[in-house]
Amino acid sequence: MNIRHFFWALAVAALLPAVAQAGGKGPEWLSKAVFYQIYPSSYMDSNGDGVGDLPGIASRLDYLKQLGVNALWLNPVYESGWFDGGYDIIDFYKVDPRFGNNDDLVRLVDEAHKRGMKVCLDLVAGHSSDKCQWFVESQQGTNGRYSDYYIWSDTIGKKDAADIARRRQAEDPKASTIGHWVEADAPRGKYYYKNYYECQPALNYGYAHPSASRPWEQGVDAPGPQAVRRELRNIMAFWMDKGVDGFRVDMAASLVKGDKDKKATMQLWGEMRRWLDEHYPQNVLISEWSYPQQSILAGFNIDFEIHIGRSAYSSLFFQGDTPWGKTKKIDNCYFNRLGKGSLKDFINIYAADYNATKDRGYIAIPTANHDFQRPNVGTRNSPDQLKVAMTFFLTMPGVPFIYYGDELGMKYQDGIAPKEGSRNRAGSRTPMQWTPGPTAGFSTCAPAQLYFPVATDGGKLTVEAEEKDPGSMLNYVKRLLALRASVPALGNDAGWQLLNTLDGEQYPMVYLRTAASGERCLVALNPSEKAVTLRTGQPAGKVLVSTGKGSYKHGTVKLAPFSAIIVRL
């Protein structure tokens, strides 16, 4: 642990007395959970309109069961203004007509449960659409039910006024994320506070340190912020009473404003977790936070270790010549054919997070998601390379999350025209590829009607083709998931120890997984185009699964380019 992470751990420890602890890691089913994320508009279209829907997802549950996943996370399915891919919600209690209706969601959940699968929804807790009835009524004055559901002001500072002026100069001001205040000139106030786009007014959870000189800053215990908390619980209860098993919370760290150390936000989620444990003990909360030492301490069962804020995930997967590599200014990521990456950034961050949270909750390292590029991007594009990456994703501790299509090796399709706020994220939202053809079996519509076009690999990377090929990516993923389910040392709760020294050889990556029973497995990964060797100092063992060419003899790992092995010691 480097000095920066040491002091961060001390800071977290200092918060322990202030943040009342929620109970344990959560329901028992999490110990064997494997999640599959579905972007509903792009998974399966049941009615030929070119957009995926809930009956379409239900029709593919048997495929998901056979794959080996046992939990689903659906991106937002609520009624939306569709300016930001469903994250601008008009009605939190209603399924958007493009996906079906509330009964369709209940049927999907029921059918999933019959197959032993859980279903979690996306909870967009921080904002609504400006078309939401709460916001429409909030504008009308100071004495209404929803007047303080949002943050209003009649005055703003010079910097905020300058941000508004800059946003006006943008090519599309409504699609600009510059600044936070939006001109409204409504009876309730001249300005409202937005989270991202103008159409996404921030819900008012209060300010951590309100100032009398800024009258719009209400404390977290003020009536408005407390009413918003009750509404959030009502939304959760509404869907959980219909059978939903939990929620992934969008931008969970952002709710309380002016909360630099996140203490007030952590207290909010601790309150939610205690409520959940009391009333819905078999349900879960998953955070988009990417700081597990905060989120899991606050009460979340799972947090993602992704690209937000810190470099752990980015240093592994975002090569410099790919869209997210350019944004993050990373020259050489670890999972790249050149073999010039380093484990240091990932391990320094991940090891600290893992050791601090392993007894409280789970870290998830997803294959990708709707907000960033897939593993198949740039020069990391062959099945051999992608199998090595998938070996990593499916043998690390915590809860695996597979983004739809990554089990096939679907590519991030650069250059797709943006739609509904997708920007360059469109390349990760193309239709699921079921069968060869112009619509990849996703829809019966004409190709021009598709929500997004099929990626250019759609003719060869399909479920139909890969199911028939014993050496396919899909069948390799099935083998990995079956192994994870049957070998306790590879499970969600088993221990983890890196065998590389960070100042020594970086390739291959080698780590141990250890079950409570003492059973141990060694995992070795070589994502580079060079043959590599590492002496591990471990005893003899038996290779359980491999991809590419590799050996394990007398404690020494030898791996050909783009190879991985899993050894039971």
Question: What do these predicted ranges mean?
Answer:
Residues 189-218, 439-474, 478-479, 483:
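Glycine-rich phosphate/pyrophosphate-binding loop
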Residues 23-227, 241, 252-300, 432:
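Acidic/aromatic-lined carbohydrate-recognition and catalytic surfaces
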Residues 553-569:
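C-terminal beta-strand-rich structural cap/linker in extracellular carbohydrate-active enzymes
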Residues 130-131, 135-172, 269, 273-431, ...:
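Conserved alpha/beta catalytic core and glycan-binding cleft of carbohydrate-active enzymes
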Residues 530-548:
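Beta-strand-rich binding/interaction modules
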